[in-house]
């Protein structure tokens, strides 16, 4: 009889919260924020009332979970007041940094910031760390690896890049962990798209294909959690050998519901090598 005691782990995955404020002075109205603030005024602000975010926090507080993942776009315009509002609202969920993983999205690096003044790092850096990759070890031989692929772009681009140094650091980690370790990658950008989706290279990862191929070559990577495109989904990618890759999109968790929407975020339960992904609707 197998005497091994199975331990389960539950992850809450939310994304693209888009906390927003408007620029308050001329310095904040720089470059791309003009375009973003216009979009916010005429469209996004009405889609993201603060009450929805508070409702999300209250719902998660009542759920049973071991780890919280936020896969980017905490803010809309990467303004300090936006980050401050995000931190204040999410604070009830962030009491134990060891139970939280947060990676930045393109809206969190919306414009170039002065050296040493990265606002994502100021308000949420403790949930990523100062290394090239973020690492959190979970129960039962599971581990979370967070990537930072967000960087400022020109006016017409919202793309990101997974750096070679990020892939190398992850490669080194995989090689030095026990063979039975299973990994979850958290990154802002998707690797797959819904059927019929019109791909835009200026909106996705610049190096999407090589990154996706790299992940598929490493069967110990079992899950890829992301956001960016505001449609929840669970996709599956087969491998030539080894278990399939599950890709979970939880964007956008705080937006108003659209017609026939079935999911706002996901709860992911891990038990031994088994994965169960449950969609959760924020009514």
Q: What do these predicted ranges mean?
A:
Residues 13-15, 67-72, 99-106, 148, ...:
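Active-site neighborhood of phospho(di)ester-bond hydrolases with catalytic His/Asp-centered motifs
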Residues 84-172, 177, 210, 241-250, ...:
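Extended active-site neighborhood of metal-dependent phosphoesterases/phosphodiesterases
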Residues 200-271:
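Conserved beta-sheet core of the metallophosphoesterase superfamily
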Residues 18-21, 76-79, 106-114, 152-157, ...:
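Active-site environment of divalent metal-dependent phosphoester hydrolases
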Residues 11-14, 19-22, 35-38, 101, ...:
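Metal-dependent phosphoester/phosphodiester hydrolase catalytic core
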Residues 8, 64-65, 97, 178-182, ...:
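A general structural motif
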